């Protein structure tokens, strides 16, 4: 059976610039899963829309008949993966440091950040609760214990609201997929697939 994993980087990142994504790809290869790096043009337009990032991902996404397909996203890439899951219908989803920019998160963010986000990301007010209710895909959540509180709260809330979800906390890790502690947690999650 063919096994494929799509890897969506964080905002402004790429496997060409951040080596952590290539290490993640190797973890998939060790499990007999073919990694596919997804390049997102984060600066394609201004103001930005998450729906544009989802469309870019779905343009390269393929699910061969009978194949197991996994989607791993980091930060904004995790949000892109989450927003695309009902259309992509993967075998499992791995959300690394899911961004806390859903409607339910705004009350815990600084007003200046919310103002910037709403100015630069139009039509990107998504309700996590409404989307989570539609998701039946097994979801692995990863977050570093040294990440900002908003990220930790978003991921812990996701664990409660997603039916078939598993939470792994990377001890000593910040919001950096290339950090050794973060990568070790990603490796452990991938080893379960």
What is each residue range found by the language model?
Residues 72-81:
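Gly/Ala-rich beta-loop-alpha elbow adjacent to hydrolase catalytic centers
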Residues 148-154, 178:
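Conserved alpha/beta-hydrolase "acid-adjacent" motif
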Residues 36, 160-176:
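Catalytic histidine neighborhood in serine/cysteine hydrolases
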Residues 94-104:
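Active-site nucleophile loop of the alpha/beta-hydrolase fold
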Residues 47-48, 173-184:
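Catalytic histidine-centered segment of alpha/beta-hydrolase-like enzymes
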């Amino acid at each position: 059976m063919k096994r494929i994993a799509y890897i969506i980087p964080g905002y402004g990142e790429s496997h060409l610039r951040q080596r952590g994504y290539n290490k993640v790809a190797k973890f998939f290869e060790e499990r007999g899963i073919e990694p596919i790096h997804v390049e997102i043009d984060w600066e394609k337009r201004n103001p930005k829309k998450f729906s544009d990032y989802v469309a870019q991902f779905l343009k390269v996404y393929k699910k061969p008949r009978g194949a197991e397909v996994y989607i791993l996203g980091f930060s904004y890439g995790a949000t892109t993966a989450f927003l695309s899951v009902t259309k992509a219908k993967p075998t499992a989803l791995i959300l690394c440091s899911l961004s806390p920019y859903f409607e339910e998160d705004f009350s815990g963010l600084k007003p200046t950040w919310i103002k910037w986000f709403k100015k630069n990301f139009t039509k990107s007010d998504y309700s996590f609760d409404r989307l989570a209710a539609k998701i039946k895909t097994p979801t692995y959540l990863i977050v570093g214990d040294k990440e900002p509180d908003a990220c930790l709260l978003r991921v812990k809330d996701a664990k409660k609201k997603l039916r078939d979800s598993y939470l792994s906390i990377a001890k000593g890790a910040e919001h950096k997929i290339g950090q050794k502690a973060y990568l070790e947690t990603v490796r452990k999650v991938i080893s379960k697939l």
